[in-house]
Each structure stands twice: as structure tokens, then as C-alpha cells.
């Protein structure tokens, strides 16, 4: 299982568009793909035509309250599943920050999924900030994809995320 974080601390650079389209392309090729919407705005979730579903975000797995596998929701596309985003993820930043191992909780939550080899790829659609959700995604990821636009502030955001990594 390969985990790819799609991240940039700057908003509006195409993280969600990249995440959703890459997930759809992988699924269309028969690759078992899980898209995790880590953004409280839940745009990846709505892009796939799904509503937010109470209790089905990454919130509880981040806090150790439930395994990731219980939060996976099928989409209408074969080979593509999602863990929807939810506004409650904004509160997860505060709760996870108080927890032990707060920067590696997502990586630990993925261990059972890696062992089961349920998915070939996991794509993490990150929020536009350098907060706890993004740092957990970076710690959990095998690869990092940083979309950016050809403008000064996008490059500035790239240098900030490079410093964090």
C-alpha cells in the first residue's frame, strides 16, 4: 500500500482537484484506491457527490477511538472508496494536539490497513494549513505531491512545507 499526501499550506492551488482526479484515474485502471478527505471543508467528499456522514471521518481513528477500516465508505465508482471530510475535523486539531504521539497518530492508525493490504493506494487530501492534520498526513505518507500555481506566494508555500518535511 502506497500512501500519498497531496499537500500545500496555501489554499486554492489544486490539492483537492489533484487528489480527486488522481484517485479516479487510479480506480479507473482497476487500482484499489482510498481517498481520505482531511479537510474540514470536505470538498473532496462533495466532489465525489457524497454528503458528509456523521461519524465517518478520520476524526475517531486519529484519536484512537476506531479503526480506519470502519470509516471507509464506497463511492459509485468501482475500486474507489473514501473516508469523507467533516467540519468536526477542525476540532480534531485541538484534541489531537493534546494526545500522546500527536504528530504520528495517523501513521499508527494505518498499520492495520497496511497489514491487510486492503488498498493499493491511499491519497490524503490535506487542508490548507501546516496544522496537526497536515503534519500527521506528512508523517504517514510514503510520498508527497505538492500542487502549486506559477506565482510567488505558491512558491513561498512550497518553501514552508519543505521546511516542515
What are these regions (language model features)?
Residues 1-165:
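P-loop NTP-binding core
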Amino acid at each position: 500500500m502506497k500512501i500519498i499526501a497531496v499537500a500545500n499550506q496555501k489554499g486554492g492551488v489544486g490539492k483537492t482537484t489533484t487528489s480527486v482526479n488522481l484517485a479516479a484515474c487510479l480506480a479507473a485502471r482497476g487500482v484499489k484506491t482510498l481517498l481520505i478527505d482531511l479537510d474540514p471543508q470536505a470538498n473532496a467528499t462533495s466532489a465525489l457527490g457524497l454528503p458528509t456522514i456523521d461519524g465517518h471521518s478520520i476524526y475517531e481513528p486519529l484519536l484512537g477511538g476506531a479503526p480506519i477500516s470502519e470509516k471507509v465508505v464506497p463511492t459509485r465508482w468501482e475500486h474507489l472508496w473514501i473516508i469523507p471530510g467533516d467540519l468536526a475535523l477542525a476540532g480534531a486539531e485541538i484534541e489531537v494536539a493534546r494526545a500522546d504521539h500527536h504528530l504520528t497518530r495517523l501513521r499508527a492508525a494505518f498499520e492495520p490497513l497496511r497489514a491487510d493490504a486492503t488498498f493499493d493506494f491511499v491519497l490524503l487530501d490535506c487542508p490548507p494549513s501546516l496544522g496537526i492534520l497536515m503534519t500527521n498526513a506528512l508523517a504517514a505518507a510514503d510520498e508527497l505531491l505538492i500542487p502549486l500555481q506559477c506565482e510567488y506566494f505558491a512558491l513561498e508555500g512550497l518553501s514552508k512545507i519543505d521546511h516542515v518535511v
